[in-house]
Amino acid sequence: MRGYATAYGAATVLNAIANWKGSAFGISLRTSAEVVLDDSEGVRGDVEGIDTTLIVRCVESVLSHFDLDYGGVVRTRSEIPVASGLKSSSAAANAAVLATVDALGEEIDMIDAVRIGVEAALDAGVTVTGAFDDACASMLGGVVVTDNLKRCLLKRDELHSDVVLLIPEEQFFSRDVDVERCRALSRVADAVFEMAIEGDYAGAMTLNGLLYCTALRRSPEPIVLALRAGAAGATLSGTGPAYAALVDDISGDDVVEAWSSLGGRIIRAAVENRSARMGQADLFQEGI
């Protein structure tokens, strides 16, 4: 039995570490998963150079959800930089969950699939809050606002914008964050949450970026440069090191130019409003 799925990366509007409320939007960088199930002993991951604990746990969790006992192998291919703050773990988890469901020939509610991936991420130790907001953005597309403690989707909108991403050379894993330092700023995070609920996503992400740059001792300079170049909003994505800016055709070029002096990799993308897709083997078919 073989199944495929493709899910998307995401960028931050509000990081949920401070107050368990989160917001994020899908971006047009993809992760595809292939799951092959058989009667062998246990599930193994096969992704060169990447820890496969998370995706293996996702497959095992789906099998448990349907009360089935199979072994097999799970593989992923991705366009999303790892440990950058662009939700590579959420995309991998979502793709692995849906590919397993596809292999089984079953159906599953999208939010139930998200929750399976979130539990797997917590078990694998790759997240502080469960990253329910990131997982919803990756799975559902558009921009979402969530209560990560209750694992409840509060709001979803479509958001039509181009995105510029700055990915510094370093990597940073969410499990290494100073949680107490972030939670000391929860009152400001509450204000960002209200902005997101009211639909001011660009303003919310900018304030979020300034807040978390302070908490995580990261430079706000990319945010300031992006705003000066005409971006509608800019932020540190997740716990970094990546930054994201919402732009149009004109300001996108200007943000790229402004960021070009900072080093690192710059990617042009777009907000992804489509949901993750079961049965889609995009990156395997494209040979990426």
Curated annotation (Swiss-Prot):
Principal location listed in the UniProt entry: cytoplasm
Database matches in Gene3D superfamilies: 3.30.230.10
Protein's cellular compartments: Cytoplasm
Keyword Kinase among UniProt keywords: yes
EC number: 2.7.1.71
Keyword Metal-binding applies: no
SUPFAM superfamilies in alphabetical order: GHMP Kinase, C-terminal domain, Ribosomal protein S5 domain 2-like
An annotated GO cellular component: cytoplasm
Catalytic activity: shikimate + ATP = 3-phosphoshikimate + ADP + H(+)
Positions with a binding annotation for ATP: P81, V82, A83, S84, G85, L86, K87, S88, S89, S90, A91
One GO MF term attached to the UniProt entry: ATP binding
A Pfam short name: GHMP_kinases_N
Pathway: Metabolic intermediate biosynthesis; chorismate biosynthesis; chorismate from D-erythrose 4-phosphate and phosphoenolpyruvate: step 5/7
Keywords from the UniProt entry: Amino-acid biosynthesis, Aromatic amino acid biosynthesis, ATP-binding, Cytoplasm, Kinase, Nucleotide-binding, Transferase
Top-level class of the enzyme under EC nomenclature: transferase
Protein family (similarity comment): Belongs to the GHMP kinase family. Archaeal shikimate kinase subfamily.
Name of the protein: Shikimate kinase
Origin species: Methanothrix thermoacetophila (strain DSM 6194 / JCM 14653 / NBRC 101360 / PT)
